[in-house]
Amino acid sequence: MQGFVKDFLKPNLVGIEQINATRAKVTLEPLERGFGHTLGNALRRILLSSMPGAAITEVEIDGVQNEYSIKEGVQEEILEILLNLKGLAVKLEGKNEVLVSLTKSGAGPVIAADITHDSDLEIVNPEHVICHLTGNTEISMRIKIELGRGYVPASSRIHSEEDKSANGRLFVDATFSPVERIAYSVESARVEQRTNLDKLVIDMETDGTLEPEEAIRQAAMILAGQLDEFVDERIISAPVEVEEKPEFDPILLRPVNDLELTVRSANCLKAESIYYIGDLVQRTEVELLKMPNLGRKSLTEIKDDLVSRGLYLGMRLENWPPASLIED
């Protein structure tokens, strides 16, 4: 049996096609027939949900008590500034968290390059616009950046009454994963006389903080680490009955009326063809704010209700909507 296992072909990373600064196609071949989809799907899921990275988690802006405050002389609303800060692509080396500062005065744009930081932090997109100042105005803020993994909503980092009542501390929903979009395809490959082999092509878009080759290496290490225990022949465990799970969490299949929202918020969502919770969680904060008659308070109401159910905005749902909803 061991001999047959060792006879399996081992893939090589044969090419990296750099499409632009943040997007690349990575090709691995040759693979045994069927292994293209097996590895492609596993790597895709890991790259999207489990890659470590750095993100902004907390902000303090002078003169601002909460995200609904108004900052005189700043073109954007505070909520929009926080959304812009989430767009910063940063790399953190040697530390688990850092506190940086930004002070800018005079009319014009405030960009990522205006942030004062040490050498352990690298800002990959220094031209990213944070806000615009109008007139002879000054803005000053402190920004907390942490290492993490996946998506962590702001509400999960509020652990005490002191955190809840802390005026001026603006907690930010953190997306730590540097991989923003990924798709894969499986093509035919050939080795000598064998023509029934697979070639795996992974199309990946990141925030620029992680090279494609390194991303594949890290994802493969995570996958291998999860499988290590199965390789040890000394481990013999009783079979575990695994309950078959539905394709989607039942909560996602429920109508938005089931959320504890005001009539106005629910009507705004339906006007944009958002009928199910699964439709809603795939929208981003920016998309919802662009909807007519849906303001910041309604957005906060929606986010809080989703977080209470273990959900958040900007989720990626494969194969949505399910056939059962389409048939209905």
UniProtKB/Swiss-Prot annotation:
<dbReference type="GO" id="GO:0005737">
    <property type="term" value="C:cytoplasm"/>
</dbReference>
<keyword id="KW-0804">Transcription</keyword>
<dbReference type="InterPro" id="IPR011773">
    <property type="entry name" value="DNA-dir_RpoA"/>
</dbReference>
<dbReference type="InterPro" id="IPR036603">
    <property type="entry name" value="RBP11-like"/>
</dbReference>
<keyword id="KW-0240">DNA-directed RNA polymerase</keyword>
<dbReference type="GO" id="GO:0003677">
    <property type="term" value="F:DNA binding"/>
</dbReference>
<dbReference type="Pfam" id="PF01193">
    <property type="entry name" value="RNA_pol_L"/>
</dbReference>
<feature type="region of interest" description="Alpha N-terminal domain (alpha-NTD)">
    <location>
        <begin position="1"/>
        <end position="234"/>
    </location>
</feature>
<dbReference type="GO" id="GO:0000428">
    <property type="term" value="C:DNA-directed RNA polymerase complex"/>
</dbReference>
<dbReference type="InterPro" id="IPR036643">
    <property type="entry name" value="RNApol_insert_sf"/>
</dbReference>
<dbReference type="Pfam" id="PF01000">
    <property type="entry name" value="RNA_pol_A_bac"/>
</dbReference>
<dbReference type="GO" id="GO:0006351">
    <property type="term" value="P:DNA-templated transcription"/>
</dbReference>
<dbReference type="GO" id="GO:0046983">
    <property type="term" value="F:protein dimerization activity"/>
</dbReference>
<feature type="region of interest" description="Alpha C-terminal domain (alpha-CTD)">
    <location>
        <begin position="248"/>
        <end position="328"/>
    </location>
</feature>
<comment type="subunit">
    <text>Homodimer. The RNAP catalytic core consists of 2 alpha, 1 beta, 1 beta' and 1 omega subunit. When a sigma factor is associated with the core the holoenzyme is formed, which can initiate transcription.</text>
</comment>
<dbReference type="InterPro" id="IPR011263">
    <property type="entry name" value="DNA-dir_RNA_pol_RpoA/D/Rpb3"/>
</dbReference>
<dbReference type="InterPro" id="IPR011260">
    <property type="entry name" value="RNAP_asu_C"/>
</dbReference>
<keyword id="KW-0808">Transferase</keyword>
<comment type="similarity">
    <text>Belongs to the RNA polymerase alpha chain family.</text>
</comment>
<keyword id="KW-0548">Nucleotidyltransferase</keyword>
<dbReference type="GO" id="GO:0003899">
    <property type="term" value="F:DNA-directed RNA polymerase activity"/>
</dbReference>
<protein>
    <recommendedName>
        <fullName>DNA-directed RNA polymerase subunit alpha 1</fullName>
        <ecNumber>2.7.7.6</ecNumber>
    </recommendedName>
</protein>
<dbReference type="Pfam" id="PF03118">
    <property type="entry name" value="RNA_pol_A_CTD"/>
</dbReference>
<dbReference type="InterPro" id="IPR011262">
    <property type="entry name" value="DNA-dir_RNA_pol_insert"/>
</dbReference>
<comment type="function">
    <text>DNA-dependent RNA polymerase catalyzes the transcription of DNA into RNA using the four ribonucleoside triphosphates as substrates.</text>
</comment>
